[in-house]
């Protein structure tokens, strides 16, 4: 069947419209339409292409994840080599580079194009007549791997260039990376699935691009920034690197923010310091800055060596990996009794701070890396991430070193250490008797999403437990103003405010109270389910594990934790103490009478809502039977977005999940007629 002219025209119009919206959203950071309208256009285009498959083209926005898995990654030869950059690590090396440039050019002043040095994976994108036809890794600079099927899945990669005077053949070079937020969320999901997390965003990006199945890559939070060009045919580009970047942006490609032209050595030094100050505030990792002689004719005069051009330099930031020695391995006890080994290090300056400790996660991780006291190790720190041991330098291992063993008794209370079959985490069996667990349990109990006791911060809890004023959470309701006023940094006014907050917290809800108790594996959503299912604390406390397993989303492990908690006499005593102190909640309605129009639907929230907090939105959805998760997955039904949404929005679009802005969300809450 020949497609009618109106269908052809509408498909072309939709592709142009969607590509324009993508440009506004990803390149100039200025969304033009609500996501609901964007999704409607995508669905319309998909429907038309299903009816007229002969009209599907490579540049269609619907074809990002259209390729089939490949058996292996082919090789692609770079017509113009993708060279490395020479590195500088201190001001003297930067000054030497600047002096060599001026001497070779025989000029008094040099303009440099200055750019952040993104810590990702270098790639080449080939456009023919404005359409993306090929993607390749840098490889060894001469030959890379064919990743066309994967590069197309990245939302920030333009499938078709826009604008005028686009060369018939244009090779664009850039860096694929994984934003910090996306990386952290992705690793949390990996751990939750029992899979190995990535060490850093760069490794995550590289591993994602080398997948054989593009559907896997499409589910990874990847993005791209462009930093230059390679092969160009059938067109003319500007004669300055900075202007080429501007032209790439006009054609619909993303370039790095903070790219600018600086003058002379002083301009380079000022730019370096500015980016160093910004480093940990950026949503992506950078490991330095790059300076390129801006004028192309000057670049040609300077030429290149076999490995790197003479006209560019990477000025690296202070190392975020350094060598140091493990002085000792200490074991910390958390709120749930989990034992976490921590390496005490010879202090070392890493990534702008002095590091003296690093997490070792668990006994299995120590054994996998064969970490021992006295070892010389590489320690890494990136942004605000807790420092960690990367690897051991075996050549420097002491001859009398011994493998580390977890203690058999809790280092805090002396209780027996237990480890579940097949589990990685060792735990103290002391429960709330253990001072370490007690302290963390009180902090959790007072948290904003639990009993919401405003003013009871971590340091105050430390003081109260240290002085013996708090032995368990029930003791909170027996505190007096006189006791509080005598503490460090606590006057009469602060004491009065805290007492008032404690009194206000007595009136709560059953789901909040259950969550506040800190039962293992019982988060906010599970607490909601339990409250609705059993209706009262007494009913829940008396049920068997078998009955608990009949509840939606409650498996055997969670059921065992709940039953074990209520079997513990000490926990029952604490609950009785809380109720005796006046902690109460309204009766939960009979579950049969509760209207839950959103039952079975899963929601994720992102961004800042204007009409309510995300916590309030979550509670309203849960009250209507909806399930609210923290991350987007193929099981998500709706993503609700506020201002400044994060990487969840990109992932939701890739997965075809329905996206609702705040206006739609409020309307749907009123009549609960979700699409």
Swiss-Prot record:
DNA ligase that catalyzes the formation of phosphodiester linkages between 5'-phosphoryl and 3'-hydroxyl groups in double-stranded DNA using NAD as a coenzyme and as the energy source for the reaction. It is essential for DNA replication and repair of damaged DNA. Residues 593-675 form the BRCT domain. Its EC number is 6.5.1.2. The active site is at 117 (n6-amp-lysine intermediate). InterPro entries: BRCT_dom (IPR001357), BRCT_dom_sf (IPR036420), DisA/LigA_HHH (IPR041663), DNA_ligase (IPR001679), DNA_ligase_AS (IPR018239), DNA_ligase_CS (IPR033136), DNAligase_adenylation (IPR013839), DNAligase_N (IPR013840). It catalyses: NAD(+) + (deoxyribonucleotide)n-3'-hydroxyl + 5'-phospho-(deoxyribonucleotide)m = (deoxyribonucleotide)n+m + AMP + beta-nicotinamide D-nucleotide. Keywords: DNA damage, DNA repair, DNA replication, Ligase, Magnesium, Manganese, Metal-binding, NAD, Zinc. One of its GO terms (biological process) is DNA repair. Belongs to the NAD-dependent DNA ligase family. LigA subfamily. Its cofactor is Mg(2+); Mn(2+). GO terms for cellular component: cytosol. The gene is ligA. Zn(2+) binds at residues 410, 413, 428, 434. It comes from the Bacteria. NAD(+) binds at residues 35-39, 84-85, 115, 138, 175, 292, 316. The keyword Aminoacyl-tRNA synthetase does not apply. It comes from Nitrosococcus oceani (strain ATCC 19707 / BCRC 17464 / JCM 30415 / NCIMB 11848 / C-107). This is DNA ligase. CDD domains: BRCT_DNA_ligase_like, LIGANc. The lineage of its organism: Bacteria, Pseudomonadati, Pseudomonadota, Gammaproteobacteria, Chromatiales. The keyword Membrane does not apply. GO terms for molecular function: DNA binding; DNA ligase (NAD+) activity; metal ion binding.
